[in-house]
Amino acid sequence: MLIDKDLLDKVSSAAKGNERLRMNYNFHDSLDAPSQRLLNALEPGTKIPIHRHKTTSETYIILRGKMRLSFYDNDGKIIESVILCSDTENIGYNIPEGQWHTLEVLVSNTVIFEVKDGPYQPLNEDDILK
């Protein structure tokens, strides 16, 4: 399957129309697949809690747009913050298993390619930092 500007535009348009201001386009056939590969179109204002994945690392590659990726310690203090932008040298990040993180979308039409181990596991209450 070709990943082109038209596909990115389609997923971004769907994100703008979604109340959560984001939309996935999955390349895996099932939520039980051992590899979860997807486009994630994100709009400014989307809310992603500080969270972690205890059993998998997670990789983001920014295809279009700009976002801030922030990392936290167990007390909720920021330990690192990076800007990922498709027009700069910082275009991706591999987030280690168990690392608290969140992101802030800085421009409209931002799209990332996201990969993590499957099967899909919704976040548990103890995977969200309060």
Where would I find each of the regions flagged by the language model?
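A short, N-terminal "cap"/entry segment at the start of jelly-roll beta-barrel domains
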Residues: 1-35, 81-86
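Double-stranded beta-helix
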Residues: 3, 7, 11, 77, ...
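Conserved short histidine dyad/triad with adjacent acidic residue
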Residues: 39-55
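Short beta-strand His + acidic residue motifs that chelate non-heme Fe in jelly-roll/DSBH
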Residues: 50, 69-71, 92-95, 101-106, ...
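Short glycine/proline-enriched turns and hinge-like loops at secondary-structure junctions
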Residues: 52-54, 61-62, 105-108
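Glycine- and acidic-residue-biased ligand/ion/polar-headgroup-sensing regions
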Residues: 55-75
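Short acidic-glycine-tyrosine-enriched beta hairpin
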Residues: 73-98
